[in-house]
A protein has these predicted regions:
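A short, basic/flexible loop-to-alpha-helix module at the beginning of a structural domain
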Residues: 1-16, 173-183
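N-terminal Rossmann-like FAD-binding beta1-loop-alpha1 element of flavoenzymes
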Residues: 19-49
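N-terminal FAD cofactor-binding segment of flavoenzymes
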Residues: 45, 53-102
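Predominantly flavin-linked oxidoreductase catalytic cores and closely associated redox partners
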Residues: 126, 131, 135-296, 356, ...
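FAD-binding beta-loop-beta segment adjacent to the flavin cofactor pocket
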Residues: 310-341, 465-476, 489-504, 511
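Active-site-proximal substrate-binding core of FAD-dependent oxidoreductases
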Residues: 337-343, 359-404, 519, 524, ...
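C-terminal auxiliary extensions adjacent to catalytic cores
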Residues: 400-457
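Iron-sulfur cluster-binding cysteine motifs and their immediate structural context
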Residues: 495-528, 534-557
Length: 561
């Protein structure tokens, strides 16, 4: 990370703009569009650049997704007339309590309000982002797809003044290839970081500026998703199913989902809290098990799997949100922890956080300010409906950390009983007290999990799954997964925890092999398989793995996810 502009990278191209946004997700694009619309309405010239590491906006983003349209209604009131790919309203909610063989369908009258989706829509977030990017570009926003941000630039007073994009064309050993292109310095009056959960630059910023001081540790889950195409008689457009219980044990947070889209497609997935304790647990394998349950299998057993992906999700709630205000920058969306875990939704909260950031920055630019701390963003955030919603959803995962029974009871009290008593604001707050990387028990004190071999029709192996993600990385580039201490993977992870990275990674990136010459075990990193879920950066017991951005465009390329 550079401390000043007076570094040795004098050969870099430099681009200047008013506002730079890192990440073309719902938060980043909404901030860009709102800023540009405000500038256009006021007759002001405003240059806005959005960087995205994907080959095109939406290519590597992943969500369930059931979307609350509230924030989009505010940003683009006529989104339907503009052809937004939001076609399938939710028609029915089901909440299923699963055992290994049975299913309890919770009566509609007892479904907590946070699981109700009347007025919401089932969407492909990737398709929505492509459309939203088009809206932003039409308004005058510049989107640089295929460019990853790898460094943060500061002035002499440690104010953020922009970023550097990644070099293109280095060999695996770091030497330059023919046609090498140095990264570009992009300078801005304000920089917005909208990288999504566990953003690599946000991680650095939180540490550098102590943005998590006094906060509860952030808590994460992994969401694993498959897209299925099924016969018309198995498709029920608008049906939303959430499951809890099996296949996860009572100590593990999480649940399944099935969202029936409008074109004979079903989005199916499993969310697993990364605070799980059994190192033998494999979120990928638990997802495969979920599909074998009769209440799930009946919807897909004559279908075909056509998509696969995974992504970390932040769900620590308000108590775990870092301070989003930086000297010269802001954290927004899932980078700031705005997902509402209790509703299993983060699109509308990301959009709203981006809109609030746009308001704060636009007013600052009107006052001829730049590169200072936008404390008014925090004020506007706390005055919004977004903050009220996050407050009411903040206890969801912390309660489940105390066990499934307590989680059920307290969710029922907070999201069913209190609303019916006329109490709109939950009068207590529960906090997460442990980071996810310290929750594993030693392997020899944990029950080993044995998973069935895949049948290739309903259940699958990891490599055939990664193939469906359309992930591509140039093999001859520096490995983007950095190991700080080469001894830890063997002496601690393998010897104590049984090598959990082989199981928590949903893409087969990490593999323990015996060296043919020394006969010693070693960790092999198949970085070309990486689908950018960020789980290794979160769950590694000693925080010995750091996820960094590979070359721009080297990402999953999801279709319809």
């Amino acid at each position: 990370m550079n401390d000043t502009l007076s570094n040795t990278q004098q050969s870099r191209e430099t681009i200047e703009c008013d506002v730079l946004i890192v990440g073309a997700g719902p938060a980043g694009l909404s901030a860009a569009l709102k800023l540009k619309l405000q500038a256009n309405d006021a007759g002001k010239e405003l240059s806005i650049i959005v960087l995205d590491k994907g080959a095109e906006p939406g290519s590597h983003i992943l969500s369930g997704a059931v979307m609350d349209p509230r924030a989009l209604n505010e940003l683009i009131p006529d989104w339907q007339e503009r052809g937004a790919p939001i076609k399938q309203p939710v028609t029915q909610d089901k909440l299923l309590l699963l055992t290994n063989e049975k299913c309890i369908n919770l009566p509609d009258a007892l479904i907590p309000d946070n699981f109700r989706n009347h007025g919401n829509f089932i969407v492909s977030l990737g398709n929505l982002i492509k459309w939203l990017a088009g809206q932003a570009e039409t308004s005058g926003v510049d989107i640089y797809a295929g460019f990853s941000a790898t460094e943060i630039l500061y002035d002499q007073d440690t104010n953020i003044i922009g970023v550097v994009t990644g070099d293109m064309g280095r060999h695996r050993d770091g030497s330059k290839k023919e046609g090498f292109q140095s990264g570009i310095e992009i300078l801005a009056k304000y920089t917005i970081f909208a990288e999504g959960a566990r953003g690599s630059l946000a991680k650095e910023l939180i540490k550098k500026f102590h943005l998590d001081t006094g906060k509860a540790p952030q808590s994460f889950s992994i969401g694993i998703k498959e897209l299925w195409e099924v016969p018309s008689d198995q498709s029920h457009p608008g049906l939303v199913i959430h499951t809890t219980g099996w296949p996860l044990d009572k100590e593990s947070f999480g649940g399944g989902f099935l969202y029936h889209l409008n074109d004979n497609k079903i989005a199916l997935g499993l969310v697993v809290g990364l605070d799980y304790s059994n190192p033998w647990l494999s979120p990928f394998q638990e997802m495969q098990r979920l599909k074998t349950h009769p209440s799930i299998r009946k919807y897909i057993d004559r279908g075909k799997r056509i998509g696969y992906g995974a992504r970390a999700i932040n769900n620590g709630g308000i108590a775990s949100m870092p301070d989003p205000c930086l000297p010269g920058g802001l954290l927004i969306g899932c980078n700031a922890g705005t997902l509402n875990a209790s509703r299993i939704k983060g699109i509308h909260t990301a959009i709203k956080s981006g809109m609030i950031a746009a308001d704060a920055i636009f007013n600052a630019l009107l006052d001829n300010r730049k590169n200072d701390i936008l404390t008014e963003y925090q004020t506007l955030l706390r005055q919004s409906w977004l903050w009220q919603e996050l407050e009411n959803g903040s206890n969801f995962k912390p309660w489940f950390k105390k066990g499934r029974v307590i989680g059920f009871i307290m969710t029922g009290i907070e999201h069913w009983l209190l609303p019916r008593m006329g109490i709109k604001k939950i009068p207590w707050r529960v906090k997460n007290n442990r980071p996810d990387n310290i929750t594993l028990q030693p392997a020899n004190k944990s029950q080993k999990k044995l998973y069935d071999k895949p049948d290739g029709k309903l259940t699958f192996d990891i490599l055939s799954s990664v193939y469906l993600s359309n992930t591509w990385h140039d093999d001859d580039q520096p490995v983007h997964l950095k190991i700080s201490d080469q001894n830890i993977p063997i002496s601690i992870n393998l010897d104590i925890y049984g090598g959990p990275e082989e199981r928590y990674c949903p893409a087969g990136v990490y593999e323990f092999l015996q060296d043919s010459e020394t006969q010693n075990m070693r960790l092999q990193i198949n970085s070309q398989n990486c689908i950018h879920c960020k789980v290794c950066d979160i769950k590694d017991p000693k925080q010995n793995i750091t996820w960094t951005t590979p070359e721009g465009g080297n990402v999953p390329n999801y279709t319809g996810m």
